[in-house]
Structure formats: structure tokens, C-alpha cells
Amino acid sequence: MLAGGEKMEIFNSRNIPNLKEEEIIVPLFTLDTFLLPEDQMMMRVFEPRYKQMLDDIVLDGLPYGHVISNPSMPELNGVSVPYDVGVLVEIDQFQEQGSNLLYLANGGERFRINSLIEPALKPEFFNSIFPSVDELVEEYVEEFPEGKLYVRGIIELIPDLTGEIDTKRWDYLLSLWKSYIEIIAQINEMDVTDLDIDNEVNNMFPIPEIKSLWKLAALILDSVEAQTLSLKAENVEEVCSLIESNIQKKISTVRLFRQSNE
């Protein structure tokens, strides 16, 4: 079975293919926004399918894949099909709070999804009272003994970005970001100076390195298109260009807003 027009095969837990040398299987957490490398996100889990996912990986310190749903694709056994890229997530500050599981998601390596493994059960709407994971497992374990409540992906890692960050290019990107922050501060009549903004940005991004590039991208790339392109990027310049064009758009938008309110 193929996922829509994408060349992404879909399997169930009884017909998982032999993996290629570079492939691994990871749980997929499908959300409505991407997490980029070096970015962080506080998570609250209450659905049984994702509680099962965390049970499967937390004790062994394994990652899962953070992906975003693709609205142009048909659902997979009641679950949204994701775009074909994502990031591996390492879990930190894991804790239970009542019936919820809380943790800090840390964005790591990028990956591409080659195939999907569908969940053993179609998700149901349970209002505010959820059944236990064990109760749901009992519904499918005889037919799909290796099944899971969540979608899994057969993935391969995307290589690190190639190239070096040019210092002048980096300084220009930071200057654009500072200009944007200055305009926002003026619109909101915030009591900050250009020096305050300059120091804050320089402290956040002290040196032009790949980690800093991804952190800057996480602040600026807020559209699905830009985030997807960054996750598929092969070299540093591609990400720099995405950052530059998106800051320019933001600056143009807030300038128009300010002019319309003068």
C-alpha cells in the first residue's frame, strides 16, 4: 500500500520488510508543528498510544521521531500521515503528573521516512476518560502480537549539513534578526535599547556554528514549507537562505503593520 501520491509504502506489524543497512524503525509522534534540530519543546502526553510509545523507549533511553501531519494525505488507519521528514527526539526531565506524562523534547538528528508501519488499532475518541494501555492492547494482541497503538516509521538519517558558516553572512543574518526585534519592541512600546537587543542576540548566538544556525532557524522558520525545506537541506547555505528570506518577510510584514497604524 502506498501513502497517496508519495512513494511511502505502508505495512502492518505482520509484514514488516527486512531493513536496509542504513534503516531503523522508530516510533513517530505526529504533531501540528515541526521541531528542528537543537530546538526544545515541553510535552504533555495523555493519550494511551503515546503513553505506550514512552513506555517502550524511556527506560532504554531510545529516541522517537517528531513529525508533522500532512493534510494533503489520506489518514492511515485513522491516524494522520506525516510529511516524509522529521527529527529524532531525546527525552529529558521526564515525570508523571496525575494521569499525564510530562517531559522536555530535545530535537536531534534529521531523518527521512521511507515507509510507515500502521497502528494495530484505529484511534478512538474517549472524551475525558481514557482506557489503559493494557486494555487497548488486549483488543489487538491476538491478531497483531507485535503491533503498537502508535505509527512507526522505517527511516534513514539525513547527513549533517555540509559547508561552513561564513562570518560575514552570519553577522548579516543576526543584524536582520536584531532589526526585526527592534521594530517589534517599538510597536509594543517596550523599554529596551538597541544595545540591549544587540547584547541579548550576541549572547544567544556567540559563535557561527551549526548548533547556532539551527537555533536561529527554530526561532524564525515558522511555516511548514520553510521548516520542511530546512529539514531536507543538504548544506549550510540552504538554511542560511531560508533564514534570510523569512526574516525579510517578517520585517516587511511588521513595517506594513506599523505604517497602517500610524
Model-derived regions: residue spans:
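N-terminal low-complexity, acidic/polar interaction/targeting segments
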Residues: 2-262
